[in-house]
Structure formats: structure tokens, C-alpha cells
Amino acid sequence: VRSKRAIHAPYPTICVGNFQAGGTGKTPAALWVAQQLSVLGYSPIILIRGYKGTVSKSTIVDSKDAYAYGDETVLHAQYFPTIVGKNRQESARLAQNLPGDKKVLVMDDGLQHYELLKDFSIVCQKRLRFELDHMLPIGRLRQIPHTNIDAILSQMNEAGYEHVESWKGIPEYTFERETILISGSKKQGLVICGVANPDDCL
């Protein structure tokens, strides 16, 4: 049940989200969007819930405390002004306290947050395409896919993406994942991965 009336943010709002549960690359995609906006002369501000963080109300991130804000939040804050909080309306209002010309809000994982209206919505996907998936718990869909989105971002170097037509005529953009190997000593190491779908890391 929706408890609040949806409102427009004081600035243009771009949402990066997904229909499926688990890691689909939302955070790096949101960071990329913010980087492109910055290159074009805009002042991006990240809005993020702060998964696993302990902060209860919307807060402008001012430290690298992953316990308080969540690790994804701290990653964003290294590059752009970031506001963490479950209440996206409150976070959007708080953005007025941040400096910058031509502000644009970038929501990391905001597709299921209906209280804040979006001007442009991007859906990330990988592996099993969302239109072929099923609702939880049988599949990984968080909600029934709808056409109230503006673009689909797909990881190209997953099997089958090269020859699949875009869903419902919505523009689809593909990208290739680049694996970067860091050279160093030949000592054994330990890899720790905290994403939902660790196959890419492994």
C-alpha cells in the first residue's frame, strides 16, 4: 500500500533500478550515469537507500563509515555528493542543501520507490532477461515488468544478448564487462565478494 503521495523532486531525477532481485549492476551503472552527467557540466547527486546501513533518516554522507551508511553508499560518496536514506522524498529535499549548479538526482535502486517521480528510468539486467523470468520465489522478479521505463542496460558478454530484440520497443543499450588483472606477487590470496551474483567476480 502506498502511504505517500508521489511528488516531483526539486531537480531532474534519473532512476537506475531493476525488476529482478540480486546483483544486476545497478550501483556501477548509477555511478557511470553520474560520471557522464558530470562530464556534460551537470552536478549529480546520488540518492541511495543504504542497504545494511544503520542510519535511520536521510543524511548527507560525510565519512567512509560503511557500517553506518552501507558499502555502496560509501563507494558513491568517494566520487559525488551522496544522500543516504529510505525516505526518497526527504533525501530529495535535502539535496537543496548541497552546492552545485544544474543539479541532477541519480537514484541508485529506486525503481520500486513510487513516492518520488522520475524523469528517466533505466533498468539493468544480466544473464536471464527479465521478460523470461518469473516472480519470486520461483524466479528472481521483484515485480511484474512494466513499460514505464525509458531504457534497458544489458551486459553484452552474457550468452544470447547479441541477437535478442529489445523488449516492447524500449531502447536497449549493451556494454561489455572488462576484466582487469592486477599484477603483483605470486603469493596466494583470498577473494571476498559481497555481490548477489558472484560469478562475474569468480
Predicted regions, residues:
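Walker A (P-loop) phosphate-binding motif
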Residues: 2-62
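Short beta-strand/turn micro-motifs composed of small residues
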Residues: 17, 48, 125, 153-156, ...
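Residues at the starts of beta-strands that form the adenosine-phosphate
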Residues: 42-44, 120, 150, 171, ...
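Conserved beta-strand elements of the Class I
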Residues: 43-47, 105, 123, 188-192
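Phosphate/Mg2+-binding loops and adjacent switch elements
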Residues: 53-165
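GTPase G-domain guanine-specificity segment
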Residues: 161-167, 196, 200-201
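Canonical P-loop GTPase G-domain recognition
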Residues: 168-181
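Redox- and metal-dependent alpha/beta enzyme cores, enriched for Fe-S-associated oxidoreductases
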Residues: 178-202
